[in-house]
Design a protein with these regions (language model features):
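A conserved acidic beta->alpha catalytic loop
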Residues: 44-53, 69, 93
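Acidic donor-binding loop at a coil-to-helix junction in glycosyltransferase catalytic cores
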Residues: 166-172
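Short, acidic, metal-binding catalytic loop of nucleotide-sugar glycosyltransferases
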Residues: 26-37
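Cell-envelope/extracellular polymer assembly enzymes that use nucleotide-activated donors
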Residues: 6-9, 39, 171
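Glycine-rich, basic loop-to-helix element that forms the pyrophosphate-binding segment
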Residues: 67-84
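N-proximal low-complexity "stem/linker" segments adjacent to membrane-targeting elements
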Residues: 1-27
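Short aromatic/hydrophobic "clamp" motif used to bind/position activated sugar donors
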Residues: 89
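Conserved donor NDP-sugar-binding/catalytic core segment of glycosyltransferases
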Residues: 101-133
Length: 181
């Protein structure tokens, strides 16, 4: 793990993601942003498959928090946010993988634009067989993953609403935009 305070904290919540978590973490570990500039916090949300074993393979490179039972995505993300040391927070879902410049570009943009509250990246959709379907413009169809926030602003709006089981990202964005737009 890092010896200095990280610039970015990446939060990954994982519930029964043994099939995808390794690829996700490998993509996060091979970033152009130096590894001592970010931390990866994985919240294992009470997985009953081999997700804990997969996470153990990365134990030297990630910080793992384990929920003793499934608490849900919003609660797990919030737990990661509360643990995060960095001033910038980005959520990446366990079944996602990111470009090698992902953290570098997002961090650089937000760091160079103090008047901007958050920054999102476009994303690509693939089907179950890894066939590329389309590139999505995040300004038209934003999702919860891939948005770099300032940690203090997430804390100020109360983070994710843990009563939401679906669309927690949309609800968070609505509250965020009301306060910061």
């Amino acid at each position: 793990m890092n010896s200095k305070e990280p610039l970015v904290s990446v939060i990954v919540a994982a519930y029964n993601q043994e099939k995808f978590i390794g690829r996700c973490l490998r993509s996060l570990l091979y970033q152009t942003l130096p590894q001592d500039s970010y931390e990866i916090i994985v919240v294992n949300d009470g997985s009953t498959d081999r997700t804990p074993y997969a996470l153990e393979l990365f134990h030297d490179a990630i910080h793992t928090i384990t929920n003793d039972q499934n608490r849900g995505l919003p609660a797990s993300i919030n737990k990661g946010i509360m643990t995060a040391k960095a001033q910038y927070i980005v959520r990446v879902d366990a079944d996602d993988y990111v470009n090698t410049n992902f953290l570098n570009f997002l961090h650089y943009f937000l760091d160079q634009n103090p008047d901007i509250d958050a920054v999102a990246c476009d994303y690509w959709l693939f089907n179950e067989t890894e066939e590329w379907l389309e590139r999505i413009d995040s300004s038209l169809r934003p999702i919860g993953c891939g948005i770099l926030f300032r940690k203090q602003q997430l804390l100020d709006i109360g983070m994710y609403d843990e009563t939401f089981h679906y669309h927690e990202d949309q609800e968070l964005r609505i509250r965020f935009e009301k306060k910061y737009s």
